[in-house]
Structures are given as C-alpha cells and as structure tokens.
C-alpha cells in the first residue's frame, strides 16, 4: 500500500498587503475563508493524509471550528512563517515520511499540481517545487537604475505545495537563517538538490485585493462547471 503524505499549512500570517482586517488565511473568498478553500482542495487529493494547520494563536479555536468537516489538526503558529512550519511539523504523526508545505493563500491550487509533487517525491526526489515560466521581462535594478536584463529563460516562478523528505525538511529548519521566503530555499542553503514539476496558473497566491477579485472570478466559472459534473470543485 502506498503511504500517504502529510501536509503542513502555515496560516498565521497577517497579510498586510490585503489591507486591514482578519489574518490573510481567514479573509473571505466567495463566502468562505481562503483557508477553507485551500484545505478542501487538499482533501480532494488522493495522496493526502494528515493535514496540520498552523493558525494565529488567538484564532486556534475559531479555525478548528471552521475546519471541523475536514479532519485536520490545528496548532498555534508563530510570528514568522518558519515558526509556523516548525510548529506544524512537530504535530505531524511520526510515521509520516513525505511532507508537503502549502500556502493557504494558494487556495485554488488544482489537485493535479499536488499529485505531481507527490509523484516526484515517491519517485525518489528529496525536495520538489511546482513552477511556471516567467512571462514578464525581468530587470535587475539598483538605486532606481536598470543594472541589467535577466534572461527569463532561466527563471521560474515557484508555487506550492512544496514537497520534502521529512528528515531533510527538519534538517533545513534546524539550520535555518532569516531572509529566505520559502522552504525550498532552506533546503537549497544546505546544498541539497531541489527538482521541479509543472505548476498551474490557478495556483496563484492571493496577496493583494486584485488577487481576491481574480480568485472570485475563477470560482464563479469553475464552481458551476463542477456542479454540472456532479462533484465538488476541481480546484478549491
């Protein structure tokens, strides 16, 4: 029998770029918090087993109530993302060897992206990230002056879930320094290889008000289609 993977969802961030109000993961999207959409999407994935959510310390009980239907563990997150990932990792059952870390703000990530990351882990990769080609021209700038144009053919935008062997993720967080924005960066700092799989446009991160509008528009299209096919949303 193929072992299930565990998923950590750091969801304690304030999300200041979305404006004042609730923590980002608890912001409303089409009548439900981003976090509910994200966890529902994870629960639609055949390979996903235990899910641990790191919530704002003041909202742990409220988040447990929100997610009652989805069989998740909710723990108090920390001031920084790394603190929340560590707290969630500590609550994951000891027998889980393959771990995904997923942003609650990437709440419309398709099932296929999750399964591609899992397949790469099961095929022997120690660390995996879903990526997309960079569409825009990218320039390096210093003091408001262009230094050079970067070859975008060598660049990729990185999404989540990011997948890891548990021992490697624990080692990376044990040696973590500040200034890195994702878990794969911590692994890279150890000198360990990180492989890529195809991401998806739908797995964008809800960071600004315009992203919320885009997510609402996408849900308005995908939810009726899923209903006509007799099931839940394909990407939630």
At which residue positions do the language-model features occur?
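Short active-site oxyanion
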Residues: 47-52, 126, 201-203
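Short phosphate-binding loop-to-helix
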Residues: 67-99
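Short, high-confidence coil segments that cap the C-terminus of an alpha-helix
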Residues: 48, 96, 124-127, 192, ...
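N-terminal glycine-rich phosphate-binding loop and ensuing alpha1 helix
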Residues: 1-60
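Glycine-rich phosphate-binding loop signature in dinucleotide/nucleotide-binding domains
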Residues: 2-3, 92-97, 122-124
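Conserved core of the sugar-phosphate nucleotidyltransferase
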Residues: 109-197, 233-236
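Residue-level signal for inorganic ion chemistry
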Residues: 9, 35, 88, 102-103, ...
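SAM-dependent methyltransferases
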Residues: 1-7, 12, 182-184, 201, ...
């Amino acid at each position: 029998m193929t072992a299930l993977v565990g998923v950590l969802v750091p969801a304690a961030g304030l999300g200041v770029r979305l404006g004042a109000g609730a923590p980002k993961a608890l912001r409303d999207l089409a009548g439900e918090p981003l976090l509910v959409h994200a966890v529902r999407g994870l629960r639609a994935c055949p390979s996903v087993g235990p899910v641990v959510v790191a919530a704002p310390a003041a909202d742990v009980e409220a988040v447990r109530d929100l997610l009652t239907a989805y069989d998740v563990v909710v723990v108090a997150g920390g001031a920084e993302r790394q603190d929340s990932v560590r707290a969630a990792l500590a609550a994951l059952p000891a027998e889980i060897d393959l771990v995904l870390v997923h942003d609650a703000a990437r709440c419309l990530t398709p099932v296929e992206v999750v399964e591609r990351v899992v397949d790469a882990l099961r095929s022997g990769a120690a660390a995996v990230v879903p990526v997309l080609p960079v569409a825009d021209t990218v320039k390096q700038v210093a003091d408001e002056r262009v230094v050079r144009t970067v070859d975008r053919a060598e660049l990729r935008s990185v999404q989540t879930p990011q997948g890891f062997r548990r021992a490697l993720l624990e080692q990376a967080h044990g040696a973590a320094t500040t200034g890195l924005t994702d878990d794969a960066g911590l692994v890279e700092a150890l000198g360990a290889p990180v492989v890529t799989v195809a991401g998806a446009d739908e797995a964008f991160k809800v960071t600004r008000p315009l992203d919320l509008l885009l997510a609402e528009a996408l849900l308005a299209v995908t939810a009726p289609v899923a209903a006509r096919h007799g099931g839940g949303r394909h990407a939630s």
